[in-house]
Regions:
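Conserved beta-sheet core of the metallophosphoesterase superfamily
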Residues: 162-238
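Beta-strand-turn-beta hairpins that frame and shape the catalytic cleft
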Residues: 1-5, 100-111, 138-145, 205-209, ...
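Active-site environment of divalent metal-dependent phosphoester hydrolases
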Residues: 13-15, 43-47, 71-82, 117-121, ...
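Extended active-site neighborhood of metal-dependent phosphoesterases/phosphodiesterases
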Residues: 51-132, 140, 174-175, 204
């Protein structure tokens, strides 16, 4: 089995040292093969916050890391930088690519930069981005788990979170499902959940899963959701059509992340 650790919404500048230490221990225990950082790495997109965030990600010692920016990762108050070079600090710490992909014999992973400098917090996906991901998915083999990573969610469970849903989510979900995607990962709202999109999007003819992550190490937690991360386990040969998403929550009393929930994803091959 291969393991993918998804961490999101770290918001460095609001990080908690005890939670960071617990996440480091979790990573050492589980030894994931891939680390996915799904946006909002910092609180205010400063070089110092990005530097600390990168050092922490490196300390997890995961062989392959994929990251993408969130809305907090572009300057808020420096309007010149926000317009002219919104990703400069992010790219200095995490690399030039804003939409990196990862291709291995068992994984086809595509990322989408859903941030826009002219939007304060809402994200959007363009037709060009949708098409680019579809092209990537079209080259995937039946042995590869096919994952798309965004920042803002393509599905929300509660009416009060609807305004945070990704703009353009519906054509994206329909196109990516038709192109063969298995999982869409996201963050942004600090609320972890797993759901089958074919149960909520009418006319979707193929099984597609939404996997949302909470906030990994930030003090900006929801009252109903502690710090959490997701661990996705998938076979070396995805023809074995079962994957597992484990949600690990931070328990303050024990000072460690503990398994809180587990969902089996039945992956469809047509």
């Amino acid at each position: 089995m291969r393991k993918l650790l998804q961490i999101s919404d770290m918001h460095f500048g609001t990080e908690q040292l005890d939670v960071m230490a617990a996440l480091l221990a979790l990573s050492q225990e589980n030894k994931p093969d891939v680390l996915v950082v799904s946006g909002d790495i910092t609180q205010r997109a400063t070089a110092e916050q990005f530097s600390r965030a990168r050092a922490f990600c490196d300390s997890l010692r995961v062989a392959q890391m994929i990251s993408l920016p969130g809305n907090h990762d572009i300057p808020l108050f420096n309007l010149f930088s926000r317009v002219m070079s919104p990703y400069a600090a992010y790219q200095k710490a995490f690399g030039h690519a804003l939409e990196p992909d990862l291709i291995t014999p068992s994984l086809c992973l595509a990322t989408v930069n859903t941030t826009r400098w002219w939007r304060h917090k809402n994200g959007e996906v363009s037709k060009a981005q949708i098409d680019r991901v579809c092209e990537q998915l079209s080259r995937a083999t039946s042995q590869q788990l096919r994952v798309v990573v965004v920042h803002q969610p393509v599905h929300v469970l509660r009416p009060q979170d609807e305004h945070d849903r990704l703009r353009g989510w519906e054509p994206a979900v329909r196109a990516w499902a038709a192109a063969g995607a298995d999982v869409v990962m996201g963050g942004h709202i600090h609320l972890p959940y797993v759901c089958e999109l074919s149960d909520t999007v009418s006319g979707l003819k193929r099984r597609l899963w939404c996997v949302q992550a909470g906030t990994a190490v930030s003090s900006r937690i929801r009252r109903e959701a502690p710090n959490s991360v997701n661990l996705l386990e998938f076979p070396d040969d995805a023809n074995n059509l079962r994957c597992c998403v484990e949600r690990w929550d931070y328990q303050k009393a024990g000072g460690r992340f503990e398994l809180a929930d587990s969902s089996v994803l039945n992956v469809q091959r047509i």
